[in-house]
Each structure stands twice: as structure tokens, then as C-alpha cells.
Amino acid sequence: MSQKDTQQEHAERANPVHEQDNAPRIAVVTDSAASLDPKLVQRLSARGNFVLVPMPVTIRTPGEPDRQLQDLTAAEVDEAIMLAHVMGQTVSTSGPAPGMFADVYDDLASRGFTHVVSVHLSSELSGTVEAARTGARLSRLGSEGVSVVDTRTVAGAYGHAVVRALEVLNSASAGSSVECPSPGYSTPNYPNPDYPTAAQLVDYIQSICEQSTLYFYIPTLDALRRGGRVSPALAMVGQMLQIKPIGTITEGKLTYVERPRTAARALERLVEVTVQTCRDQRHAAALTSAAAPEMNPSPACFSLKATPRGEVVAVHHVGNAAQAVQLYEQVQQMLGESSLVHDTADSSAPEVLVSALPPVLSAHSGLGAVALVVY
């Protein structure tokens, strides 16, 4: 069976409650910078209402053909990028072309989807959002049929929002319940006879992203310098002072939280700032819950409310998976909780998303990087 036939079969199984004519059907599109594990992507794609668009990564050597990395395994990518940095080769990244997005949107339209929610990394870090918007205008659905979301963040900080949005769609299409809280309630599930609108889904995704915080550790500024993310002067100073930065994303841009001088101290502080953010979110949620008036939930309501729990929801690494998971477990221990890491292959939506950073991000972070996402 060809890949196109397989996609068609998946599409026919997607959203079974809405197979009648003129019924709304929503698909979700994202890019590889969402940092979703390949096994999870395969499982999410099985319903036919999800597409991940790859982002090209190229190693350039003068006098030699460019080398593309997207078809390599995670281990091969780590090795290729490490060798490229050692040999002084240029590792370049780029967003998908508008035509690629237009083709994806057209394919989804041909399979009966009436709207696409296209979710992408911060426009401050990449031209992907603009390419998606241009692709929407070129597609059969047009700008009216494609909602492009500028998440203003990166990696699992929006990757987990994509997973949660798909959970909502798939639960609604299966006729089961989704989170439908009235004011003062944050956990109960009620029967949901309706299907979310694209606008509701966009608001839900944006709310999750706004309330998610990503912290990352990179062992050297050199990879960021090669990718043009920091100036050569700053990278040189960082190398001279042996700076091991801890960073985050603020208003869509890369910013630094601290600049420790040793790897051990940097990793220690990464855990500490992550724990503090978890505690701050939990405290804020408790205050909000205490201040909310007591109201009886209505079984007929349909509402999507993003409610952060002050937990680590994603863990990323570049060639150091064991270390990344160990840091996550340290966070859990300091919070007095057990680890929630599961094998991605065993669940369509694991409680904690653990994945290698994709080439489009690892090219800039370098080997040994770690990232933790709190929501």
C-alpha cells in the first residue's frame, strides 16, 4: 500500500462522528521544532487529522554537495552535527517553503477537512509562521480556512499544546468527554455533544503556550554563534569565561536566565529554577481556585480552559537522554513526587513528553543540551 493510500485510510477513520456532509472537521499541523518523539508523531498521525511538516537542516562544506539531515536517525544526527561543529562546517536551518504548507493544506482539504489549525514556533526565531500564512493564502482553504498560530515559544512548550489539542479533537469526535470546567472547577469531565470550533482550539493552544515555560542549558555558545543566534563577540567572551548559560524564551525571543561558569552549577540551577517555577504556578493556581466563586458545573457546557498544574510536561536532550531524565527526576524529588516518564510507544499522549531535540534545534544548541518545560 502506498503512503498516499495509507493517509487516505487514516483520514477515513478520523473524526467518525463528523462524517456527514457539511460537518466541521479540523486538522492540526505543526513543524518539527515542536520536538515530538517520532513514535508519538506516528501514533498521533494514525487518525489522519495531524501532519508534522519537517524543517530542513543542511551541513555545508565548501566545494562539496550540501548534506541534508532530516532522513537520519537521532544518533546519526547528533554525530553529524558534532562532527560539523568540530570541523568548522556550517550547519544551517530554514523553515519549510510556503509551497510545502500549501500542499499540506490542500491535501487535508481534499480529505474532507474544513479547517486547519497550523501551530508553529515563535516568529521571532524563524520565518515558519510567515511561510505558513503564505501557504494558507495559496491553498484551497485560503486564509479563512487555515488558522496559523504563532506560539511565541519553541520545542515542547508548544509541542505539548499540540498534543493536548489533538486529545480534545479526538475525544470530541469519538463522542467521549473532554475537560469542560465552569468557573471554580478545574478537573471534572462532562459529556461533550459538540465539536470545538477552530477559534476555540486556537485560543486553547495559545493559552497553553502562554502559560508554559521552557528552560534550557547549553554547554557552549559556539553552536549558537554558528547558527547566527548570538554574536561572535559574545560567543568569544562566553568561551573565555567558560560560561554555561541557562536560557528561556521571553516574548518569543531567546533570553538568558543565568550564566554559570561550570556545567555542574548550570545543571544544578536548571533544576532549581524549574522547581521554583513549578511551585509558583501551583501557588498561583491555588489562589485562583480559592478566589473563584462556587458554581455548579453544567453538563451541557462546552469550554476549553487551559489550566496549568505546575508540572514538568516535556524533557528534551541532545545525545544525553539519561542525563535529561535524571534532571527531571531530581525536579520530581524536590517537589516530593514520583517520575511520570513513560515509553512514548505505549501511549498516544504520555504524561511527560521525552524526546531528542530535532536537528533544526540541536544544530543551534549543540551536543549535551537539555531543556525542561513547565506547565
Indicate residue ranges for each PLM-predicted region:
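Mixed-charge interfacial surface used for oligomerization/domain docking
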Residues: E19-R25, A33-L44, F50-V51, M55-E64, ...
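Actinobacteria-biased recognition of intrinsically disordered, low-complexity terminal regions
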Residues: M1-A23, S177, P183-S186
